[in-house]
Swiss-Prot record:
Main location: nucleus
Keywords: DNA replication, DNA-binding, Nucleus
Name of the featured protein: Replication protein A 28 kDa subunit
Location within or outside the cell: Nucleus; Nucleus, PML body
Post-translational note: Phosphorylated in a cell-cycle-dependent manner (from the S phase until mitosis). Phosphorylated upon DNA damage, which promotes its translocation to nuclear foci.
Lineage, uppermost ranks: Eukaryota, Discoba, Euglenozoa, Kinetoplastea, Metakinetoplastina
Compositionally biased tracts (Low complexity): 1-24
Recorded GO CC terms: chromosome, telomeric region; DNA replication factor A complex; site of double-strand break
GO biological process: DNA replication; double-strand break repair via homologous recombination; nucleotide-excision repair
A GO term for molecular function: single-stranded DNA binding
Region (Disordered): 1-28
Length: 258
């Protein structure tokens, strides 16, 4: 009887904890950020960081490994006792330290210098500098850096402008360019050409919302792009460019996929 009741209580507690964790994830989702955004984040005490008026407790950043937090880490000395690898990474908007938890009982080599990585985890402030602690993985596709920067731009736009389209910016992509400057990637946009930027945006939309083989329709792509001040004509032109370059294909039911 007691065992049954204890099991019931344990299940209820586990269910409650799981619900609380899911609620916390909804309230504080993992935010794609540039390093510039992290370095310029507002500190409100207790190690809490605020970006675009929202508290950030979990984040994803990308960058190239340019050094190690521990000078002996490259040879393995000191990393095991600390139970983490610390990497200094840059995305050309700034530089921070990201940490990867490791199993002290397993032999593990640090990621080599000059490798492009994606770091995701908890955001903390250490010695007055932001750090991300969690997982650090190598990026196989160099385009992931561009897609991450676009994610950071779009997230900044959603949080600062919502779905409103600034008057006078319709079709110009100016709101996207302004947001690119805000997150520090304005010089990374190919030639500053909005049409080139739109092709990257459309590929990003399909990657995130295409649902496997389903892809996205022209109407869905147009609606997504219009939220960021691009016109239907802009979308059609960009999709023709992507099709000509072999970056997207049209399915039998007139949808687009990559």
């Amino acid at each position: 009887m007691l065992a049954s009741q204890a099991g019931s209580n344990f299940s209820a507690a586990a269910s409650s904890n799981g619900g609380q964790q899911q609620q916390q994830r909804r309230q504080h989702p993992i935010r794609p950020l540039t390093i510039k955004q992290m370095l310029e984040a507002q500190s409100v005490g207790g190690g809490v960081m605020v970006v675009d008026g929202r508290e950030v407790t979990q984040a994803t950043v990308v960058g190239r490994v340019v050094g190690y937090e521990n000078a002996n880490m490259a040879s393995g000395g000191g990393a095991i006792t600390a139970k983490h690898f610390g990497y200094r990474i840059t995305d050309n908007t700034g530089m921070i330290v990201v940490r990867q938890w490791i199993d002290a009982d397993r032999a593990q080599e640090p990621i080599p210098l000059n490798t492009h990585v994606r770091a995701s985890g908890t955001v903390n402030v250490w010695q007055q500098s932001p750090i991300v602690t969690g997982t650090v993985v190598s990026m196989a596709d160099s385009n992931e850096m561009n897609y991450h920067m676009l994610d950071a731009i779009l997230t900044h736009l959603r949080l600062t402008q919502g779905n409103k389209r600034a008057a006078g910016n319709i079709g110009s992509g100016a709101s996207v360019q302004n947001s690119a400057a805000a997150v520090g990637v304005q010089n990374m946009l190919p030639g500053g050409d909005n049409k080139v930027l739109l092709t990257d945006l459309l590929v990003s939309f399909i990657k995130q919302n295409g649902h496997g083989d389903a892809g996205m329709s022209m109407d869905e792509l147009t609606m997504a792009a219009q939220r960021y001040s691009f016109t239907p004509g802009d979308v059609r032109t960009a999709m023709r460019t992507l099709a000509a370059e072999g970056k997207v294909y049209q399915t039998h039911d007139n949808r687009f996929n990559i």
